[in-house]
């Protein structure tokens, strides 16, 4: 009998998660069926109920579902509650309880290690303040790293405990303070869906030794990643984080470790 997995989001045009699900399960000796299900926010509760009813083992979530998913799971992990974000859901067949977790932060720490950056000492600046950004920031804090700086279009809401705690570490998009933060970043992460024209440019605006990470991904490296590489910077797109967070998703679902190489190979094979 095949394991059934899915990825939910809207849009899902370039998702690679089904390939990663199948490759990870194959590495564990499990047959797997995985599908991409375009899911608007208002359809999320009913979709999760259907997947649980039909015997799915779990699913991954992408934008814009990570934050609303917190209210759709019976038992969110402590990390998911702190980040107010869920990207991995497990449907427990034994208890019938729907479990929610966020693996973005743990995957980000693995990505930094792969790129030779010490999470405990690197200066991270996040562009955006949504669920993914919170997951990354909290993971850095739990590793004992320097508190991250955040640049976003909107000031954190008064009731947002994480955003409110940023204080002077938050800067408004386009401000002089934001420009200074970006210029001092050792790791600069775009956690928004914005395109290249709206993002800080590599030549002159970003430190030459910085690592640039663009969380969105598509069929080819983004224009921002391409420009950063052309300027001589180390740069990776969201596929790198996707692979690392997928390994942690498998731990949530099966309590087993998946080797990194089969997942990387699956991404390389994908169109």
Question: PLM features: what roles do these ranges have?
Answer:
Residues 2-115, 219, 231:
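Phosphate/diphosphate ligand-binding glycine-rich loop within oxidoreductases
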Residues 9, 102-105, 112-113, 121-145, ...:
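Glycine-rich adenosine-cofactor-binding loop
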Residues 117-123, 207-208:
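Short helix-loop-beta connector
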Residues 142-147, 231-233:
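Conserved S-adenosyl-L-methionine
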Residues 145-166:
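NAD(P)-binding Rossmann-fold cofactor-contacting core
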Residues 166-236:
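Rossmann-like adenosine-cofactor binding region
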Residues 215-271:
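Adenosine-phosphate binding glycine-rich loop
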């Amino acid at each position: 009998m095949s394991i059934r997995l899915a990825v939910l989001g809207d849009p899902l045009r370039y998702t690679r998660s089904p390939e990663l699900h199948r490759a990870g399960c194959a590495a564990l000796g499990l047959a797997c069926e995985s599908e991409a299900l375009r899911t608007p926010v208002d359809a999320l509760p009913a979709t999760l109920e259907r997947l649980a009813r039909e015997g799915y083992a779990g699913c991954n979530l992408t934008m814009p579902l990570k934050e609303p998913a917190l209210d759709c799971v019976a038992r969110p992990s402590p990390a998911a509650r702190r980040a107010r974000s869920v990207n991995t859901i497990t449907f427990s067949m034994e208890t019938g309880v729907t479990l929610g977790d966020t693996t973005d932060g743990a995957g980000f720490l693995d990505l930094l290690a792969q790129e030779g950056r010490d999470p405990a000492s690197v200066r991270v600046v996040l562009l955006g303040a949504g669920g993914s950004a919170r997951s990354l920031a909290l993971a850095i804090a739990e590793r004992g790293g320097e508190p991250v700086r955040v640049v976003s279009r909107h000031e954190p809401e008064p009731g947002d405990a994480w955003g409110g705690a940023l204080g002077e570490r938050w800067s408004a998009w386009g401000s002089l303070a934001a420009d200074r933060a970006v210029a001092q970043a050792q790791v600069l992460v775009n956690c928004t869906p914005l395109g290249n024209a709206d993002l800080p440019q590599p030549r002159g605006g970003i430190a030459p030794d910085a690592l640039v990470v663009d969380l969105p991904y598509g069929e080819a490296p983004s224009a921002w990643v391409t420009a950063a590489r052309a300027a001589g910077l180390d740069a990776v797109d969201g596929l790198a984080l996707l692979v690392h967070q997928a390994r942690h998703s498998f731990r949530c679902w099966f309590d087993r470790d998946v080797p990194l190489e089969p997942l990387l190979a699956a991404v390389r094979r994908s169109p």
